[in-house]
């Protein structure tokens, strides 16, 4: 007999009495249930005896720990005996002995399910064994967290995954989109629930798949195999079942947390009025961010709007371009800059300057640029391909060849006097000027005239001219040129002679004729 055993005993009954006008009704004194059996003070499980009545003073935590340990050992003993004797689990339970308990009322069986081989998979034996195993998994996990140094039974194997189902009340609230709230934008809400709880969540059942899409069913995956039941999302039982959430995890604590978070989403969807669901509002905002259609709207602030209106703005009508003279843009933005319609037109430039002097200027940045002394004299900035090339001298091989000088004189132009001939004698001096005195007589012949090919060196002011050779008279001065004035002993130059009105006689390129002999 288990620690949870109950027994309905005969006792004083009031069924034969008339209570508040009710008619007399006779029922049986006792009712047989699946927990019926012979009461006992001790329960022998394996080699140990467990007390069925707690007589000591225990706290609530200690009583819970004892019940968990007792129930784990009892379930393990039943499964162990059924495995050793190759018998059914129902034969070891009071509910399985229908012959000994003719008044026992069993629960109705669910609709049958069949596997790929055509065998029924949800028999009473399979469902009872699965229920005992799930109960033991849960109790072992709870006992491991509450009992210090707890050791699970020897034949116990922890399942790879356990699962739970949460049915969604779609029939009660058909207007609420529970699937959309649980999934969220692109599955982010369901993914967040999985990260917070540590369990795996999946929406299954009718309505979990869009219309027009079919899911392949696999009859091998059913509720009887706990370790493989929900590894494949396409379950035969989930397709015909109502809409529900399947929570799969390796621990019951994670499953419990996932159940709590899922119920919060469902309750918020039911209790929130239309348009006031914060979860749905956040999902719509997140979806707009993902799609790139979010438009941020700021609340109206009167102070901010007033300060924005009072702020002085830029009057475009007062901007005058210095390049084209038009209104509404700066010179740096002018399209006609550097063209004939711009700086090269003095009339337009004068109009722009006159308008600029009369119109106030409100662009502070433009004023700072004009007042900056570094900008004075700065040329207009042009791209390199528009700048003029500097005057660089050409290399010798690119210079044009000049024609050689010709010995033949060109013919004189018509209407002009011919130039003086180099072979003709010089004209006589005018009568106003006296001829120079003849040189003094000398016995020596005059020196030969200097050659016209070699020019004498220019006189130097630093060095005195060399003295003439002895015995040779100095050459006479050229005709038509007055001798230099003598120097005064005081070192002061005499006043210049009066200017002559007559022009000097042209000099010939040939040597002058020698003077007549004395």
Swiss-Prot record:
Basic and acidic residues bias spans: 19-31, 363-381
GO BP: mRNA processing; regulation of mRNA splicing, via spliceosome; RNA splicing
Record-level Gene Ontology MF annotations: mRNA binding; zinc ion binding
Ranges of biased composition (kind: Low complexity): 225-240
Zinc finger (CCHC-type): 319-336
Pfam family, one: SF1-HH
InterPro entries: BBP-like, KH_1_KHDC4/BBP-like, KH_dom, KH_dom_type_1_sf, SF1-HH, SF1-HH_sf, Znf_CCHC, Znf_CCHC_sf
Annotated KH domain residues: 167-233
Primary site of residence: nucleus
Biased composition (Polar residues): 340-361
Subcellular location: Nucleus
Keyword Zinc-finger: yes
Top-level division of the source organism's lineage: Eukaryota
CDD domains: KH-I_BBP (cd02395)
Keywords: Metal-binding, mRNA processing, mRNA splicing, Nucleus, RNA-binding, Spliceosome, Zinc, Zinc-finger
GO cellular component, one term: spliceosomal complex
Pro residues: bias regions: 408-518
Role summary: Necessary for the splicing of pre-mRNA. Has a role in the recognition of the branch site (5'-UACUAAC-3'), the pyrimidine tract and the 3'-splice site at the 3'-end of introns.
Family: Belongs to the BBP/SF1 family.
Name of this chain's protein: Branchpoint-bridging protein
Organism: Debaryomyces hansenii (strain ATCC 36239 / CBS 767 / BCRC 21394 / JCM 1990 / NBRC 0083 / IGC 2968) (Yeast)
